[in-house]
Every structure is written in C-alpha cells, then in structure tokens.
C-alpha cells in the first residue's frame, strides 16, 4: 500500500475544480457559439456577403473553452499527493479556482451568445452597428478573462497552507 501524506479527500476537491473549470467554460462556449451561430445563419440568408464579417462572436465564444482548459491543466498538474502533501486547503483552493474560471466563462458565453445573435442580425440591417457590437463583445469576453486571472491567482495559493 502506498503511503499518502495529507488529507485523503483533498484530491477529490482539486479534481472537481479542474472539471468545473473545463465543463462550465465549455458550456458557456457552446451556448455562445450556438446562439450567435444561429444569428449568423439567419442573417446569411439575407446578406451572404456579411457572413465572414459576422463570424466574430462565434470565434470569441469558442475562446472561452480554452480559458477553462488552461485552468484545468494548471490545477491537474498541481495535484500530485504522492510527491508532496496535499491538504484540504489545497483542494479548496483548486476547487475555488475552477469554479471562478468556469462560472465566469459560462456567464461570458451567455452574454456573447445573446449579444452576438442580436448584433449580427442588426448589423445586416444597419452596418454602422458593427463597431458597437464588437465593443460589447469585448466587454463580455473580459468577464471570462477576469475569471481566468482570479483562477490563476487562486490556484497559485494551493500549497501555501503548510510551513514545510
């Protein structure tokens, strides 16, 4: 039997954080891609020349999944209870890191999807709205970036609970 140093339930919370980061971020990316993709498809029937210009919300929504992947990889590389002690503090730090990034990605994906859908449809009617749509999408994407930054900070706190 291998020896284990630390709390035996702590890795569960760490892996749960990695899963939460990836799952929630990908849910946001999927919603944003689907919602804005429907807008692009319906707009493309009327103005097919604007399809490539209107694909921006779909791309921005797809990036959200990458943020969750980054945090999930950071968390999973920090979980190695056989190499060093892994305590509940570490598991909770990784869980909060994953939830911060994942839920921020989910909310950003919802915002990007709704704004992207309405924005590309409105852009077909009035091309001057394109810059405004892009600015709103950037602010929605910033929500996910905030979650990524906080997630990195929280995951770096793991391992600081002990004096060794």
Swiss-Prot record:
Query: Which segments does the topology annotation call Lumenal?
Result: 1-9, 76-94, 155-164
Residue ranges annotated as Cytoplasmic topological domain: 33-54, 117-128
Q: What is its main location?
A: membrane
Q: Which InterPro entries does the record associate with it?
A: ATPase_proteolipid_c-like_dom, ATPase_proteolipid_csu, ATPase_proteolipid_su_C_euk, F/V-ATP_Csub_sf
| TM regions (residue ranges) | 10-32, 55-75, 95-116, 129-154
Q: Which UniProt keywords apply?
A: Hydrogen ion transport, Ion transport, Membrane, Transmembrane, Transmembrane helix, Transport, Vacuole
Keyword Membrane: yes or no?
A: yes
| Annotated GO CC locations | proton-transporting V-type ATPase, V0 domain; vacuolar membrane
List locations, semicolon-separated.
Vacuole membrane
SUPFAM superfamilies per record: F1F0 ATP synthase subunit C (SSF81333)
Q: Which GO terms describe its molecular function?
A: proton-transporting ATPase activity, rotational mechanism
Tell me which residues are marked as the site Essential for proton translocation. 141
What membrane topology does this protein have?
Multi-pass membrane protein
Name the family: Belongs to the V-ATPase proteolipid subunit family.
What is the role of the protein in this entry? Proton-conducting pore forming subunit of the membrane integral V0 complex of vacuolar ATPase. V-ATPase is responsible for acidifying a variety of intracellular compartments in eukaryotic cells.
Query: What subunit structure does UniProt give?
Result: V-ATPase is a heteromultimeric enzyme composed of a peripheral catalytic V1 complex (main components: subunits A, B, C, D, E, and F) attached to an integral membrane V0 proton pore complex (main component: the proteolipid protein; which is present as a hexamer that forms the proton-conducting pore).
Q: What is the protein name for this chain?
A: V-type proton ATPase 16 kDa proteolipid subunit
